[in-house]
Amino acid sequence: MKRIAISIRNRVFVESILFMLKQTGEFHPVRLPSVWPERILIECRSIQPEILLMDVTPAQPETTIEGRLKMLEKLHQEFPECKSVMLCDETAYPELAQDVMHAKQSRLIDGFFYASVTTGYLVASLSSL
């Protein structure tokens, strides 16, 4: 079973993802209670996830792409094998969606999804990481 840590602010969205991941029987998903980088690192030390799924928004400095990438740099120092996946709303934030795509192209992250992704595709893609 793959351990996956989820740092997504939207409660409805994260609950839907948790439900779908649990249904497959392939994942042990854990919702991280905070978006603060220090708290994410502390939680990840406890969970030791194989995948970290995070949302990216311009709402808070911690959830911007810059904030998330900075946190991932620290995370990968401790957990180099942990895959990092970002989720963003391509309709509300088209420029941010482009930045996330460029982060993947630059190999700063292992994967990304847009908010319009179906849960089936999300689960299948995470299984393949």
In which residue ranges do the predicted regions lie?
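Extreme N-terminal starter segment of soluble prokaryotic enzymes
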Residues: 1-4
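C-terminal output helix
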Residues: 114-126
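Alpha4 helix (beta4-alpha4-beta5 surface) of REC/receiver domains from two-component response regulators
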Residues: 64-66, 70, 83-111, 120
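Conserved sequence signature across two-component system core domains
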Residues: 7-8, 52
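Two-component/phosphorelay signaling modules centered on CheY-like receiver
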Residues: 11-37
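Acidic, metal-coordinating helix/loop segments flanking the phosphotransfer/catalytic sites
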Residues: 34-51, 61
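Conserved phosphotransfer microenvironments
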Residues: 52-75, 91
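His-Asp phosphorelay/catalytic-motif detector in bacterial-type signaling
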Residues: 76-83
